[in-house]
């Protein structure tokens, strides 16, 4: 879905979409392909901990928030000098976007669930050499009547 979204954004501007694995969603490992109900049933203790202390959880055969944060931050560090003074559009997934927002606000990963996101919500972060400013977060105005006040909390 992220690639389709990126292509829809790029097409009218004649831009080419480039993919970066560093912006992939957190690897849920053994949870991949399961519904929330199935995860709760098969991994009740781990799921509870994911809700309460996500920063302390590594999913079986999956990733931790620290690992996701490291790869996303690495991609930002790689992109910044290549696009200094330019506007770029990164299209990613729930956990990486939440971590980018937390980083811009100077908040730790344990605040993951403090950030509410809607599907296709737009977030704008301006980066300097030593700073980040959150300009817009989870804007869904482009969806018009499709969205009401119900930003989802999918975790």
Q: What are these model-derived regions, one by one?
A:
Residues 40, 65, 69-73:
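Amphipathic, non-transmembrane alpha-helical scaffold segments
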Residues 43, 54, 72-76:
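Short amphipathic alpha-helical/adjacent loop interface patches that line ligand
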Residues 46-67:
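Short glycine/proline- and acidic residue-enriched helix-loop micro-motifs
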């Amino acid at each position: 879905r992220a690639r389709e979204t990126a292509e829809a954004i790029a097409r009218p501007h004649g831009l080419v979409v480039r993919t970066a694995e560093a912006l992939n969603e957190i690897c849920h490992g053994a949870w991949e392909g399961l519904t929330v109900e199935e995860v709760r049933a098969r991994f009740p203790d781990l799921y509870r901990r994911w809700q309460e202390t996500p920063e302390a959880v590594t999913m079986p055969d999956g990733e931790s928030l620290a690992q996701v944060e490291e790869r996303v931050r690495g991609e930002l560090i790689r992109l910044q000098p290549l696009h200094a003074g330019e506007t770029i559009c990164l299209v990613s997934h729930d956990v990486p976007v939440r971590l980018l927002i937390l980083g811009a606000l100077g908040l730790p990963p344990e605040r993951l669930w403090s950030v509410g996101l809607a599907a296709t919500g737009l977030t704008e972060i301006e980066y300097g050499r030593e700073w980040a400013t959150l300009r817009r977060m989870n804007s869904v105005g482009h969806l018009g009547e499709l969205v009401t006040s119900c930003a989802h909390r999918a975790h």
